[in-house]
Structure formats: C-alpha cells, structure tokens
C-alpha cells in the first residue's frame, strides 16, 4: 500500500513513491508522486531524477529522464496497458545543481497493477 519509502544505498537520500488511486488498474490513469528528501528527511530542493518503469519482463515501459522536483516533490500521470507487477526505479541525479557523481543514488519499488 502506498506510500512506499526507501533509502538510497549510500544513505544520502530518502525516496518516497505515492500513487492515487491506491489500487492501480490497467487502462486507467494513475498519478504517481515522487518525494525526495535528504538524509535528515527534509525535502531535497532542486532534485533531479530519472523515473524508469519496467514490466515483469524487465521491458522499459516508461523512461522519464531529468525530471526536476524543485521542492523535492513531483507528480506524473501514467497509464499501464497490462496488469502485473511493475518495477519503478527512481535514480537521483543531482540536488541543488550538484551532481551525485559516480555513485548511483537509486531506489526500486515493486508496484502491482490489477
């Protein structure tokens, strides 16, 4: 059940993924909200990220690069064509204009589509 929250591997960021409606159904639009916070759990200002969604066969169905969450949050409207479990990857690429560098600050969520 949403929201889901993960900490990146280095622990520099917390990423939350929320969605409405809470039950995702194929063919209907779902609003996903990405929240990025720093290690103290304050909103990360000017956070850039990539949002990648893959189906159960690891085929990329959505690939949104360089998304800007100016106040640490941003929403995306997405419609899934088929039911199944999708993997939502969120890769933080920069915060306050400072690149995250060689380290991949990424989280993954498993999300069911009915």
What are these regions (language model features)?
Residues 1-114:
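N-terminal soluble domains immediately following signal/targeting peptides that reside
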């Amino acid at each position: 059940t949403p929201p889901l929250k993960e900490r990146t591997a280095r622990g520099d960021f917390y990423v939350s993924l929320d969605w409405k409606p809470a039950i995702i159904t194929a063919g209907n639009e779902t609003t996903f909200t990405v929240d990025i916070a720093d290690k103290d759990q304050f909103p990360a200002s000017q956070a850039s990220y990539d949002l990648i969604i893959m189906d159960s066969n690891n085929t990329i169905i959505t690939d949104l690069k360089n998304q800007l969450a100016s106040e640490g949050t941003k929403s995306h409207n997405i419609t899934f064509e088929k039911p199944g479990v999708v993997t939502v990857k969120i890769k933080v690429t920069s915060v306050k204009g400072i690149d995250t560098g060689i380290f991949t600050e990424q989280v993954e969520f498993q999300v069911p589509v009915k």
